[in-house]
Amino acid sequence: MQEEKVNLSRRNFLYIAASGLGGIAAGATAVPFIGSMLPAADTLAASKTEFDVSTVAPGQLVVIQWQGKPVFVVHRTADMLKRVKGHDDLLKDPNSEAIDAVQAEWMKTPEQRIYRSIKPDYLILVASCTHLGCIPLFKPSAGRKEWGDSVPEDWPGGWHCPCHGSYYDLSGRVVNGSPAPHNLHVMPYKYISDTTVLIG
């Protein structure tokens, strides 16, 4: 039997060519597959909401939509801002420091944690009670006039959840004794002009 001489350079070329074509085929298959897992353009557009806060009158609350959820936007008056402070003993998490709570990344300074907003005048919160997701009612008046005997006489005003009786102050901080475990959530947002916020 005669041994045939193997052409190693040709074998290496065929091996490299086949491997290269296999890699190209795998990449061509993977790109559309991975692309199909990315959100569609309309989904990305819905994940962010722009809103002009200057359209909210002082003392007024408006409800807008973000990712299918209602969002409170409140233009707090000077009187409302005064009533945000001075009742920490009534609150579960007065400085918004709970580790497992949903808070925006920008909430770093003590003032931002108390007012829970980038600009103290404008408060932007997810309009969903942190107990079971009901929408709390906005009752900005101080004292028991709108609240009844279930709150202290010097109550500063805020929100009341009619489903199970949770209370929140004018910064959306939950009151001791409420079934809600956390303050109302502050979603990520930023100002893209002096009066326009981009939520999401």
Question: Could you say what each language-model-derived stretch is?
Answer:
Residues 53, 66, 74-75, 126, ...:
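Pocket-edge structural micro-motifs
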